[in-house]
Amino acid sequence: MSDLSQALGFLCLILCILFALFFLGTLIYFITSRGISVISWEFLTEVPRRAMTKGGVAPAIVGALYLTVGAIGFALPLGLACAIYLCEYSPAGYIVNIIRLSINNLAGVPSVVFGLFGFAVFVKVFGFGVSILSGSLTLGIMALPGIISASQEAILAVPQSYKEASLALGATHWQTIRKVVLPTALPGILTGVILNVGRVAGETAPILFTAATFYTRGYPDSVFSEVMALPYHIYALMTEGTRPEVQTGIAYEIGRASCRERV
């Protein structure tokens, strides 16, 4: 009976995997077959011209890179520091449990809420305006809970014997963290960072309120400039009635970039 149950469970697992792969393959084929025809060197490297009917999406690609790099550059050091404190220095107690629960809850907050928060705080209160800086900080705050959670799990997965051996050899607590804990936890930390890079790069709602504009004549010249970004660009094109094949081409390029990041 146990062998039959194991076989049925394995069969269900295989069917679920095949089901997911089928829809993934269908999605990739649909986007590729409809969008590959408009992908060209001009499309990827030139600025838009003639009311967005000519040229390319280079400013949107560059803008998305600026926002993603800025967000991760803000979230990674802060998130890693928070994870180290919560795992290695904070005393066990009610307050720490509340903080951890709050971090886990923040990871499930809709992105539009982060966008409204960024608009109210960074755009209005701090006076950064609709800019790369406001968008990067908003996206960084959105990525922060995920990076903290992934870093905590990776640090807690380090065997206690590694730490005890380091301390027994005369290393300080901080030396043990820097030389033993972090190198061992690095794969798990990087996995969390990569997943959050994919999330940040594809979000539209936060930058809709804080950073994005539909059209610029060139590339941004400072962190206080408005910026074109691929996610918002797709949203704008879908609502402006432009040619569907161009929209699909941009979607293909974003999908290919996202797959490359995850690999």
Predicted features and spans:
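Transmembrane-helix boundary motif in ABC transporter permease subunits
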Residues: A71-I103
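Hydrophobic alpha-helical transmembrane segments of multipass integral membrane proteins
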Residues: V62, Y66-F74, L78, C82, ...
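Transmembrane alpha-helices
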Residues: I72, A150-S151, H173-A211
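Glycine/proline-centered hinge or cleavage motifs at structural transition points of membrane proteins
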Residues: P110, L169-G170, P183
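Short coil/turn motifs that cap or connect alpha-helices
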Residues: S161, T172-H173
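Generic hydrophobic transmembrane alpha-helix motif, especially the helices
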Residues: N104-G140
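Interhelical loop and adjacent transmembrane-helix boundary motif
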Residues: A51, G55, I207-S258
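Periplasmic/extracellular loop-to-transmembrane helix junction in inner-membrane transport proteins
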Residues: M1-C12, F30-A71, A92, A236-T248
